[in-house]
């Protein structure tokens, strides 16, 4: 097997990694390295006098053989890229004979081995990963579209909290759609040379993918900021600037992505804009994402501390407990019933009792552990695992977690914060079965409020 045929076979194997990793095109790195080596070899050969007896410098597709005198042997190590296959690359020898260069010895498949079983194993593995993330994104898109339709159609559910949820759902849809667009544009088929592809569609798909990713992280951060402000506020009517969150959630990704596109057009308009993660312009995209994940993690810890401090038996006030049940555990607080006055009025005739709305069941340890787990998909805390590692680190674990499980994040968020939301379920039931609208006030929370002893009242409050 000659060097060109062996290089082609290696590229076929590397292409499997490229399809699975999206922007980590190992085969493109290999091709780029070969092209650089070939160019350097040809330039060196042009500056050498080949008129003397012997063998001229030549490029055989993998290695650059220098000018050599007749009867001499030359030994060169295999290209460094073969070390990716976990084996120690050997060396190849060639003899300069009277008739020219001899064939490489040992042959390239022997000197620069690639385990043949990798072809089948890696193809099966990466194909499975692609099927998983394609299925996950498809399910997420359907679930998120239904969730947005519900939150938009039911007027009683309109409030800042659900507005932010809707924006986050939209970013998950955009992110999943960008994955499909990029797969279609960059990996159109096995014969597509996406390493040298420089079409407008390819570049647009990469830019849209980066924009979708940034908007998703920005709205994950918006969720954390909103909840932190909500829990830290002292007045039930104090609200964070919702429209500032909207402006930041969509405006900052537009600004960063636009800046990155401008830099690529001006300074690095090569191939499909998605090959060199070492480029300094890559940090225009990567930097804000790393920062948002770090801030989100800090807010996550801060929220847990606030809940521990304010939700104790003697410290949990009306406003904080209301926000806790309404935001973190929206499906587990039983619905309030219509107030009923007592008919057996005795000495305590000034007391009006309303059925408990579920706060009594909000035991701190159990609720705190549940809310902690539920904040992880809502804030994207799981991204902290790989976000500060190099893109090529831990690929064996990173691929199934980030591409596979990450594709279902939108579905999980839609289920937890819409389909299992008690407020949403009751409003749907009211619309479907015609229940009394008073059973679901527009902005209901599960709280209780105790007035002075002679007139103890338990009421429902409105807080979103």
From Swiss-Prot:
Q: Does the keyword Protein biosynthesis apply?
A: no
Question: Which Pfam families is this protein grouped with?
Answer: 7tm_2 (PF00002), HRM (PF02793)
List membrane-spanning regions.
Answer: 131-151, 168-188, 211-231, 241-261, 284-304, 373-393, 399-419
Residue span of the signal peptide, if any?
A: 1-22
Q: Identify its membrane topology class.
A: Multi-pass membrane protein
Question: What ranges does the Extracellular topological domain annotation cover?
Answer: 23-130, 189-210, 262-283, 394-398
Supply the name of the protein. Answer: Growth hormone-releasing hormone receptor
**Gene3D superfamilies per record:** GPCR, family 2, extracellular hormone receptor domain, Rhodopsin 7-helix transmembrane proteins
Q: Which family does it belong to?
A: Belongs to the G-protein coupled receptor 2 family.
| Glycosylated position list | 50
Disulphide linkage map: 41-64, 55-96, 78-112
Q: Which body tissues produce this protein?
A: Pituitary gland.
Q: According to its UniProt entry, what is the function of this protein?
A: Receptor for GRF, coupled to G proteins which activate adenylyl cyclase. Stimulates somatotroph cell growth, growth hormone gene transcription and growth hormone secretion.
Report the principal subcellular site: membrane
Q: Name one GO molecular function term.
A: growth factor binding
| Membrane-side (Cytoplasmic) residue stretches | 152-167, 232-240, 305-372, 420-464
Superkingdom of origin: Eukaryota
Listed A to Z, the keywords are: Cell membrane, Disulfide bond, G-protein coupled receptor, Glycoprotein, Membrane, Receptor, Signal, Transducer, Transmembrane, Transmembrane helix
